[in-house]
UniProtKB/Swiss-Prot annotation:
Keywords: Isomerase, tRNA processing
EC numbers on record: 5.4.99.25
Statement: the UniProt record of this protein carries the keyword tRNA processing: yes
Uppermost EC category: isomerase
Residues annotated as catalytic: D48
Originating species: Yersinia enterocolitica serotype O:8 / biotype 1B (strain NCTC 13174 / 8081)
SUPFAM superfamilies registered for this protein in UniProt: Pseudouridine synthase, PUA domain-like
Gene3D superfamilies in the cross-refs: Pseudouridine synthase, PUA domain
Catalytic activities: uridine(55) in tRNA = pseudouridine(55) in tRNA
Any one Gene Ontology molecular-function term assigned to this protein's record: RNA binding
Swiss-Prot/TrEMBL GO biological process terms: mRNA pseudouridine synthesis; tRNA pseudouridine synthesis
Protein name, per record: tRNA pseudouridine synthase B
Domain of life assignment: Bacteria
Coiled coil: none
Amino acid sequence: MGRPRRRGRDINGVLLLDKPLGLSSNDVLQKVKRLFSANRAGHTGALDPLATGMLPICLGEATKFSQFLLDSDKRYRVVARLGQRTDTSDAEGALISEREVNVTQAQMDAALDSFRGSSQQVPSMYSALKHQGKPLYEYARQGIEVEREARSITVYELLFIRWEGNDLELEIHCSKGTYIRTIIDDLGELLGCGAHVSYLRRLQVATYPSDRMVTLEQLTAIVETAQAEERSPNAELDALLLPMDSAVLNFPEVNLLPAVAAYVKQGQPVHVAGTPGEGMVRITEGEERNFIGIGTIAEDGRVAPKRLVVEHVDGANPVVAGVAAGNTP
């Protein structure tokens, strides 16, 4: 019997992809997975095909921590087309109303100010939120309206950039779960003229730097050049990745001596002096501060592992951040 076929290589890290216009987040995810020959990949919050910009893609063990990027703040640049409302609240939808734009700067300023801070937002029917296991947009395409509960959101910053003709450009820093299309649709109705999103770009996720974004074209060029030169592109591709723990840098660090870390790697909680009183922590090991996973502070003050990094070595058993599976510290 032959050896089972490998699905891909074990590569761990976070790629900041600059998602192109016209492709879905899953489309670009699959392209990145193939280019890296990765065995596992997942994105951290979908962007509509109409949208471009930062889409963090987690490879390998980094997928264990992708949820924390889903829960992080986002920053967007958006252009709203005033005077036209569509059924999807963006340029891809059908026009459902067209009205004149008779809005003063004072009225605009007052309307924008009403969106700053915390509020309740009813998600769009054209969203990926699920109802009975099916995305809302599938119901919407069938002409079915589903009752949606309002959700708490926070707009930390809403910057007025420009207003030329019927195009209004804004920059919005917001909490997780905020639908920019819904903000623009609500703004249009508040102004009495209607509006939809004509341009949307995600500038930032959490604290990731925008200058570390790479495009599909750059990745493809690296692979094609390597193939033409009959060499592996892996080293060049891997240099573009950010560390796995970049997804959880907002958690306090608990640094363990190797002897103590060995217990954590086996799933055992440990007492560590000087830990936070509660909440999630990022666990590192030794003077090198190697990331081994995340944990929580238990009621008795011990650090309890929650998700640990598993390293894969060709021809060997999986290793939990340096300890072979099954070993006892």
